[in-house]
């Protein structure tokens, strides 16, 4: 590789390296800004609107991961997401700020995107339709299928006349269908639909010629069941349907069309021609004898048969079985089943209708039972008849016991006979809610869900069961059940949650499970503090209250600051909220954890645990209302959340109160003339709802008034709404910069000044000063903590472009604020994204739209050499910002308040870790470039004796014709291109010169030896004329170029040393030369020459 190739590579790669370095430094700088924002403050900037949810039983505000700064980046709006978990009527969202208040009913379609009860007039939040198949096996002798439907989530105590829908049930078998219907009703909101299966469906599947014979299923012929929800007729009855008792209808005909409601699958039933023998329940008396019976409900006059079996391995030759019954049943007969093996005789020792039966069994011959193949065999059958019960219905007991010779007896065995005049086929437990939110862990208050157990008879009659119901929870660490089986509950002592946890309910011989989902808060809870390091605020003195210890005087304070007796420096405030996720374990072991909303969503539970929050050391910090943290004294402490039921700590967060003082660097001011509120469904969850409150700035009529919203930024980077500070600790003084446009009202009835419109105009017309409290003011001068300006627009009669959505009269009159939805055209939901891409917006105004010329951003003071964090947030997150709303900071009154003092504080802090890293990275890049240049020089010396081709030498023949144009202050700003500045263009004569010549002209820090020769300057450089003609600023020749003529001659250097100096382009007035102190004969060694050259570099 020759030196010319090396120069070409450097020429090509140096812009790439420089660009990469610049790009990397920009990325690092941008990431550093965001990291510093998160380091100092967890709160994004927003309009401090207060939201309240009314008419909801259980609701929560939410936080989505990494979305707060994206959605809340302006003082003009606030976006809050919330969840309506449980409500019996339409909730109402209230947004208020100062004197402005706005309410909006949350539409049902936002809470229920897919509502099967949407056509009803009833609010059906949390309603779910659940179906129970009463018999999964259907026989030809009784070809009926019954399905019970029940509304879960409906309030049983609300007995309003609701127009509940009808349900149509479909049974499909091959290509035919059968239908049935029922209408929901009653306090429990249930009904039973009945379908009669066709006789042909019980036969084995038909064989079609040319096809394989379908395999017979042992369970029977499967039939699929579906249902559809449809409204009733004018009288509330279900629409008349065709009878399907003969032959059915081919599926897809008649009622099944595109306009029909969607079908929902229920399950499958199996059809059999003949019923199989019912399974027997075994009651084992000991290892030898067992009693068997069929668990079922019987009526008066029915006879039950109890088979008695003996184990094949029984070694006893004789035993006596005693059966004792009470009034209502009697033993009517004993029959021997294995007369060849056992001799069975009933004793006549006891007589009477209800006398116990004594049956003596004697084995005839030893070893005769060996012919039995099974493990046990039947010895006899005992028939028991059911008589008229005394108190119908009742349960009769039969007591069994076995005696052996030698007075050896077994334990007593009891079998139950359930006597009833009704033919019960199923019992079903119904819960009013499908899930339980276990907030008892947080509050200590029991959360219970009512349960009712109903029975269903063969004819479809439903009746509630009050007594004789038994229940048991499968896991009491998840959910518990009451002794009377009338509700399931959680009391805060549970350890976990679970999906579909089972609670079993039993009535007589019938048993049915109740499945529920229990959500528990994930521990430990997360305490979110907007600023975990609280400092004293320099210059902000507040009165000392009785329970507040005065801060010790600082050595930096002057005598004037110590004069204010009874006052101390204010500490920073921080906002506190507690977040958690409600989770539940999967029903199967090893399954994934289930979340109430999703893994990216957290629930704000601050209001639930406010009474159990405390600061471990109250002398260091104080927690006001569980939401505002105030520093008290230097030290470190923790915020703790205690369990209401034990001594456990559910969460804790360390906070520090520092001795270092901070100053207020910026005061952001937003004028509010009204509020608008819009709602939209969250794109991240179908249950979360976004509420966007916007501040209106336009004043539309004379004397219309506006309120003030303020945020403060401190020198440590934290930002905080001014509303969280006590209004007694400071005061705001507003000044109109144009009395003709707006005026200021200092009404003592309101804590902050009021701005009133006078005439049309716009701009930064209001200056707001933040002062310390009157009792802590100095004797002669007002102590101004911060100054901010507010932009405002007054346009009378403007109702079309961007009107306020609220009519504002006097602020104390109780204003009615309309929703901006009424005046804006609705736009379709779009996807969140960049300004170029789609984004979700509400029906009125989204987060990134609607900010035209009438919407001004808050203006902050910028200190010299300091970036404003609030501006960084706004500019980086909202691309549609109107830049004209930022007035020049140099023109703002009071913009230099505390500048010098703040600069000293910033200088004392030194470099941050990010800055150190950036400088280290820059040093590495510079070192890499320096090594690259040294390698280039070494490469040039190594190949200095090589010759260039003849064609290349021809390109050097006109080196004396070079002419360079330069500026008076800068010859060439970029040594890679002649024209590098947008404002000034430096022209090069003869652009078509050979590239090797141009390369030699622009080489800055290296010498290129070609053919053993160096270029030497033989002419003097000419400068500009000292006097230039004055020209107007707009003249294209107002900036003259300096013409420099340089003549080069190729002088051979036999000793290898450069005989001339290579021209180096710089920003000096004259062109400098490398090794200008060296004469051609001074250097005899190339290495020493290169060392001298390296020193210059």
Swiss-Prot record:
InterPro entries: Ig_TMEM132_2nd, Ig_TMEM132_5th, Ig_TMEM132_6th, TMEM132, TMEM132_3rd, TMEM132_C, TMEM132_M, TMEM132_N
Disulfide bonds: none
Keyword presence, Lyase: no
Protein task: Regulates neuronal morphology via inhibition of the WAVE regulatory complex (WCR), a complex that controls F-actin cytoskeletal dynamics.
Main location: membrane
Membrane topology (Cytoplasmic): 935-1097
Annotated PANTHER family: DETONATOR, ISOFORM E, TRANSMEMBRANE PROTEIN 132D
Positions on the Extracellular side per record topology: 31-913
The protein, known as: Transmembrane protein 132D
Segments traversing the membrane: 914-934
Family: Belongs to the TMEM132 family.
Higher taxonomy: Eukaryota, Metazoa, Chordata, Craniata, Vertebrata
Biased composition (Basic and acidic residues): 233-245
């Amino acid at each position: 590789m020759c030196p010319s190739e090396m120069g070409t590579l450097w020429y090509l790669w140096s812009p790439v390296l420089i660009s990469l370095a610049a790009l990397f430094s920009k990325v690092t700088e941008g990431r550093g800004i965001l990291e510093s924002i998160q380091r100092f403050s967890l709160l994004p900037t927003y309009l401090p609107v207060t939201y309240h949810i009314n008419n909801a039983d259980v609701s929560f505000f939410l936080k989505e991961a990494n979305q707060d700064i994206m959605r809340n980046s302006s003082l003009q709006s606030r976006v809050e997401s919330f969840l309506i978990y449980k409500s019996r009527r339409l909730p109402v969202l209230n947004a208020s700020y100062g004197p402005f208040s706005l309410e909006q009913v949350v539409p049902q379609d936002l809470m229920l995107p897919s509502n099967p009860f949407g056509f009803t007039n009833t609010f059906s939040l949390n309603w779910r339709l659940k179906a129970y198949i009463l018999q999964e096996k259907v026989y030809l002798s009784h070809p009926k299928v019954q399905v019970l439907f029940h509304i879960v989530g409906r309030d049983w105590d609300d007995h309003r006349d609701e127009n509940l829908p009808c349900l149509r049930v479909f049974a499909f078998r091959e290509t035919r269908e059968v239908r049935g219907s029922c209408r929901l009703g009653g306090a429990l909101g249930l009904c039973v639909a009945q379908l009669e299966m066709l006789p042909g469906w019980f036969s084995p599947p038909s064989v079609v010629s040319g096809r394989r014979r379908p395999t017979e299923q042992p369970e029977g012929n499967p039939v699929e069941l579906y249902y559809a929800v449809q409204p009733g007729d004018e009288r509330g009855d279900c629409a008349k349907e065709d009878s399907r008792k003969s032959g059915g209808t081919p599926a897809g005909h008649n009622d099944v069309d595109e306009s029909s409601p969607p079908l929902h699958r229920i399950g499958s039933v199996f059809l059999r021609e003949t019923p199989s023998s019912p399974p027997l329940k075994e009651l084992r008396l000991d290892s030898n004898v067992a009693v068997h019976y069929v668990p079922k409900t019987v009526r008066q006059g029915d006879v039950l048969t109890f088979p008695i079996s003996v184990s094949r391995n029984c070694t006893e030759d004789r035993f006596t079985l005693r059966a004792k019954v009470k009034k209502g049943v009697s033993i009517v007969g004993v029959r021997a089943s294995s007369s060849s093996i056992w001799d069975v005789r009933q004793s006549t020792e006891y007589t009477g209708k209800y006398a116990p039966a004594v049956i003596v069994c004697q084995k005839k011959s030893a070893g005769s039972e060996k012919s039995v193949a099974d493990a046990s065999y039947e010895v006899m059958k005992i028939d028991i008849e059911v008589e008229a019960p005394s108190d119908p219905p009742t349960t009769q007991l039969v007591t069994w016991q076995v005696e052996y010779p030698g007075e050896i007896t077994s334990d007593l065995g009891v079998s139950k006979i359930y006597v009833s005049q009704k033919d019960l086929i199923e019992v079903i437990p119904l819960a009013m809610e499908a899930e339980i939110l276990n907030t008892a862990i947080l509050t200590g208050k029991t959360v219970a869900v009512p349960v009712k157990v109903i029975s269903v008879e063969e004819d479809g009659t439903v009746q509630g069961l009050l007594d004789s119901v038994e229940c048991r929870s499968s896991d009491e660490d998840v959910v518990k059940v009451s002794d009377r089986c009338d509700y399931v509950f959680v009391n805060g002592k549970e350890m976990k949650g679970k999906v579909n946890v089972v609670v079993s309910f039993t009535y007589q011989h019938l048993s049915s499970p109740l499945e529920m989902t229990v959500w528990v808060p994930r521990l430990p809870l997360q305490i979110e503090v907007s600023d975990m390091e609280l400092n004293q605020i320099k210059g902000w003195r507040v009165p000392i209250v009785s329970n507040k210890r005065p801060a010790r005087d600082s050595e930096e304070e002057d005598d004037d600051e110590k004069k204010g007796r009874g006052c101390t420096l204010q500490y920073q405030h921080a906002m506190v909220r507690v977040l958690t996720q409600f989770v539940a374990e999967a029903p199967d072991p090893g399954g994934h954890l289930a979340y109430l909303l999703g893994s990216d969503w957290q629930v704000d539970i601050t209001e639930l645990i406010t009474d159990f929050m405390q600061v471990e050391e109250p002398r260091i910090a104080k927690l006001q209302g569980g939401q505002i943290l105030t520093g008290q004294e230097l030290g470190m402490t923790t915020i703790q959340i205690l369990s209401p039921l034990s001594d456990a700590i559910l969460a804790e967060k360390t906070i520090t109160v520092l001795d270092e003082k901070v100053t207020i660097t910026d005061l952001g001011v937003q004028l509010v003339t009204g509020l608008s509120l819009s709602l939209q469904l969250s794109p991240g969850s179908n249950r979360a709802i976004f509420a966007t409150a916007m501040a209106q700035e336009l004043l539309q009529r004379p004397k219309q008034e506006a309120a003030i919203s303020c945020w403060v930024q401190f020198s440590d980077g934290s930002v905080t709404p001014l509303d969280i500070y006590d209004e007694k600790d400071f005061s705001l003084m507003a000044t109109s910069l144009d009395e003709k446009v707006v005026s200021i009202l200092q009404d003592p009835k309101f804590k902050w000044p009021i701005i009133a419109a006078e005439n049309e105009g716009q701009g930064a017309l209001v200056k707001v000063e933040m002062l310390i409290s009157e009792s802590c003011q100095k004797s002669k001068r007002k102590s101004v903590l911060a100054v901010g300006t507010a932009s405002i627009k007054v346009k009378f009669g403007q109702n079309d472009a961007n009107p306020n959505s609220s009519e504002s009269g006097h602020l104390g009159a109780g204003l009615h604020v309309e929703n901006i939805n009424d005046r804006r055209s609705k736009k379709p939901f779009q996807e969140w994204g960049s300004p170029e891409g789609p984004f979700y917006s509400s029906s009125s105004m989204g987060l990134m739209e609607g900010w035209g010329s009438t919407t001004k951003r808050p203006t902050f003071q910028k200190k010299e050499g300091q970036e404003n964090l609030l501006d960084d947030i706004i500019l980086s997150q909202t691309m549609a910002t109107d830049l004209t709303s930022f007035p020049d900071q140099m023109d703002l009154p009071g913009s230099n308040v505390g500048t010098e003092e703040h600069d000293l504080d910033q200088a004392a802090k030194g470099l941050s870790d990010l800055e150190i890293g950036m400088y280290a990275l820059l040093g590495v890049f510079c070192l890499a470039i320096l090594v690259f240049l040294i390698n280039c020089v070494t490469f040039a010396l190594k190949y200095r004796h090589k010759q260039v081709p003849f064609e290349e030498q021809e390109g050097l023949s006109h080196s004396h014709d070079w002419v360079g144009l330069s500026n008076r202050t800068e010859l060439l700003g970029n040594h890679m291109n002649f024209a590098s500045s947008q404002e000034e263009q430096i022209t090069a004569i003869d652009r078509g010169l050979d590239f090797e010549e141009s390369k030699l002209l622009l080489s800055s820090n290296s010498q290129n030896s070609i053919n053993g020769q160096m270029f030497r300057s033989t002419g003097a450089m000419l400068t500009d004329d000292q006097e230039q003609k004055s020209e107007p600023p707009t003249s294209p020749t107002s900036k003259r170029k300096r013409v420099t003529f340089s003549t080069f001659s190729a002088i051979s250097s036999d000793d290898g040393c450069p005989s001339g100096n290579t021209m180096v382009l710089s920003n000096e007035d004259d062109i400098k030369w490398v090794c200008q102190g060296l004469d051609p004969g001074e250097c005899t060694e190339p290495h020493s020459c290169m060392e001298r050259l390296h020193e210059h570099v």
